[in-house]
């Protein structure tokens, strides 16, 4: 779902930072 996508994107951003 959309929430899952946002969670995955958030994890990606945190990892990149």
Swiss-Prot record:
Going by the UniProt record, its keywords in alphabetical order are:
Amidation, Amphibian defense peptide, Antibiotic, Antimicrobial, Cytolysis, Hemolysis, Secreted
* Tissue/organ expression: Expressed by the skin dorsal glands.
Task: Report if keyword Manganese is assigned.
Answer: no
Segments crossing the lipid bilayer: none
Q: Which GO terms describe its biological process?
A: defense response to bacterium; killing of cells of another organism
For this record, an example GO cellular component is:
extracellular region
Q: Which residues carry this modification: Leucine amide?
A: 17
Q: Where in the cell is it found?
A: Secreted
Q: Which family does it belong to?
A: Belongs to the frog skin active peptide (FSAP) family. Ocellatin subfamily.
Say what the protein does. Has hemolytic and antibacterial activities.
Instruction: Write down what this protein is called.
Output: Ocellatin-5
User: Whose protein is this, by species?
Assistant: Leptodactylus ocellatus
